Amino acid sequence: MIVVDTSAVVAIAFAEPERESFVRMIEEADKALMSTVSVVEARMVVHGRRGQRAVVLLDDLLRLPMFEMVPPGVAEMDAAYAAFVAYGKGSGHPAGLNFGDLFGYALAKVRGLPLLFKGDDFSQTDIARVGVHHENQRSSR
């Protein structure tokens, strides 16, 4: 089981170079959790770049049986705020997590699961990355 960030589903939706490896990692995980806040963020990004028809295709992807949408509860709320203080935009930390990032981070943190993402922002935090052992991730920085 893994948590999927907005950046990963957007990369899949837009057929970016990471698409095939991200799809493979999701399939290998059997279950891919995604914060409902991250889903809204993904819809916003896709709509902004490609319009509503692309959002319909994104929603079709997220309806596949391996995806489970998880609304934030109190634990995720607290973890998202803690992540904002430690890693959020304006905190001075190089990760500079945005609002949507905080909820993917929080879901992964609360569930103790690795996060599938694109980019370098999360790799500058303490969250485990899908396919990378946490110790290796930290030492490669």
Labelled PLM ranges:
Residues 1-34, 47-60:
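Short, well-structured N-terminal submotif of metal-dependent ribonuclease cores
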Residues 19, 39, 55, 77-81:
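A general structural signal for well-ordered alpha-helical segments in protein cores
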Residues 69-114:
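Active-site neighborhoods of divalent-metal-dependent phosphate/nucleic-acid chemistry enzymes
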Residues 49-53, 86-89, 132-136:
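Short, hinge-like loop/turn segments at secondary-structure boundaries
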Residues 2-5, 34-35, 97-98, 136-141:
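Histidine- and aromatic-rich ligand-binding microenvironments
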Residues 105-141:
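Acidic, PIN/NYN-like endoribonuclease modules and their adjacent C-terminal/linker elements
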Residues 29-32, 66-68, 113:
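Short active-site oxyanion
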